């Protein structure tokens, strides 16, 4: 028996229902052959915010973005701003600042690249621990992204990822991380079911086919775990709400990208995806390092809260109380998520359930909450909002857009006709395909990390949130790939 390997393919922005439909109609033959059993094709819940970058971290660390202090693809650090020392206390990973991601999340947390040093990384913005030779797209990633941004030729980048993936096998690696970006970007540019997006799914199928043929040629197939996952889903966007401009229209002076040279600001709006946003609020005339708790937001910014809830573009808003509980508001009601420790939560509602669950009040562990909410509009909503507020960079108010809307308008070039980042199922439910069968239980993307370590025979580091889901034998399968619409939408 040869030593084991793992190849982790991030099929960026792929939807499980679209994959299921294309497999059922015979349009993805290589993927169907590579993952032939239902136990090899599972739904999983991603993390909030459901956006590239922060949503890579669960795969590579087994932890949530909030626990790693990377709460969005754009963030503002009010604690660092109050101190005014060191690096600028804000980021946008849409561009050259993506090269700062490795230094921006917790330094004490090992990545798969650290644990499996014979590694290769292809087009990943998170690659801390990968050896120099294994960073196969290093500086060239920015050039390829710039080329595709101005030409819309993401197909060329997808093919380049395929070539680099196959070339990485020459290194005899134990772990390969490969991002395939074209489904996501063609979805943004058109629609998640447009002809260009579907063509990108077919190119993904070609990549899987060539990879498996090469594994067979090298006689590595039986000892290689191939995992194909998505970091987020996608849904059509018909209306944009420019949240920073909307805040300015209400009398605020917001700091936001790309207008980062403004220093006379009383708020900050950091949009991710573009389906979610952090809103930071200044107390009085000076910025203080502590987050503004829910009690003060209600007292001093009640008009803002009410105005946000009146907007049809906004589905959920959340704040954090001084006692650590997260308050969730929507037009349907108010909920409180109280962490009790050891992965347990108390959930209560007032005036209706903001998530629309109904009947979920009480004390739950995280796994049971996931199981109870998996088929709802907001799968894993309480757990995901609570983890996000672990980060001191998380806003005083967290906003999740409604389906069909996003939160960035005039400064998004090119315009997004499909998006992600929000808390609803369209963006949170993703495919997890594995050549080793997975158990018939609710899954999260944080589970990928410990499952890979199990396959590789490595111990799981302390503090990991995810669960090892590797199973050698399974009961008959009943799960289906849930799409963003309903469990019945899938062709799996």
Model-derived features: where do they sit?
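Polar, surface-exposed loop/tail segments
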Residues: 317-330, 458-483, 490-492
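A short beta-strand-to-alpha-helix junction
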Residues: 261-275, 288-301, 437-470
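Beta-strand elements within well-structured catalytic alpha/beta cores of enzymes
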Residues: 3-19, 34, 59, 116, ...
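His/Asp/Glu-rich, glycine-adjacent segments
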Residues: 55-203, 327-375, 394, 404-408
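Short secondary-structure boundary/capping segments
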Residues: 22-26, 136-138, 191-197, 240-247, ...
């Amino acid at each position: 028996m040869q030593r084991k390997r793992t190849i982790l393919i991030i099929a960026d922005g792929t939807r499980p229902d679209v994959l299921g439909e294309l497999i059922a109609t015979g349009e993805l033959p290589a993927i169907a052959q590579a993952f032939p059993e239902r136990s090899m094709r599972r739904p999983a819940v991603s993390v909030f915010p459901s956006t590239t970058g922060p949503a890579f971290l669960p795969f590579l660390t087994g932890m949530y973005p909030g626990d790693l202090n990377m709460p969005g693809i754009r963030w503002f650090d009010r604690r660092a701003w109050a101190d005014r020392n060191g690096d600028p206390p804000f980021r946008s990973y849409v561009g050259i600042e993506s090269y700062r991601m490795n230094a921006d999340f917790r330094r004490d947390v090992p990545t798969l690249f650290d644990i499996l040093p014979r590694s290769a990384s292809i087009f990943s913005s998170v690659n801390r621990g990968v050896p120099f030779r294994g960073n196969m797209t290093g500086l060239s990633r920015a050039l390829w992204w710039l080329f595709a941004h101005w030409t819309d030729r993401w197909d060329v980048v997808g093919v380049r990822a395929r070539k680099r993936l196959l070339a990485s096998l020459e290194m005899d690696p134990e772990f390969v991380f490969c991002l395939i970006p074209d489904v996501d970007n063609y979805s943004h540019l058109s629609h998640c079911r447009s002809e260009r997006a579907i063509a990108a799914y077919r190119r993904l199928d070609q990549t899987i086919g060539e990879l498996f043929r090469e594994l067979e040629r090298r006689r590595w197939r039986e000892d290689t775990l191939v995992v194909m996952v998505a970091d987020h889903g996608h849904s059509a966007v018909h209306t944009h709400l420019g949240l920073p401009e909307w805040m300015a229209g209400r009398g605020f002076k917001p700091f936001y990208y790309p207008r980062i040279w403004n220093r006379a600001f009383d708020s900050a709006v950091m949009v991710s995806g573009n389906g979610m946003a952090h809103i930071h609020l200044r107390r009085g005339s000076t910025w203080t390092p502590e987050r503004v708790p829910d009690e003060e937001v209600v007292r001093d910014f009640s008009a803002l809260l009410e105005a946000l809830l009146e907007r049809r573009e906004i589905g959920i808003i959340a704040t954090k109380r001084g006692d650590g509980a997260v308050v969730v508001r929507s037009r349907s009601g108010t909920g409180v998520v109280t962490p009790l420790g050891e992965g347990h939560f108390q959930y209560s509602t007032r005036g209706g359930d903001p998530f629309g669950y109904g009947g979920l009040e009480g004390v739950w562990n995280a796994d049971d909450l996931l199981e109870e909410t998996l088929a709802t509009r907001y799968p894993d909503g309480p757990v995901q909002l609570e983890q996000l507020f672990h980060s001191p960079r998380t806003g005083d108010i967290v906003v999740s857009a409604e389906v069909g809307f996003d939160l960035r308008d005039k400064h998004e070039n090119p315009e997004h006709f499909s998006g992600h980042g929000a808390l609803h199922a369209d963006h949170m439910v993703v495919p997890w395909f594995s050549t080793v069968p997975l158990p018939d239980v609710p899954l999260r993307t944080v589970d990928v990390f410990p499952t890979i370590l199990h396959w590789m025979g490595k111990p799981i580091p302390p503090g990991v949130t995810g669960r090892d889901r590797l199973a050698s034998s399974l009961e008959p399968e009943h799960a289906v790939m849930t799409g963003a619409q309903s469990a019945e939408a899938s062709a799996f």
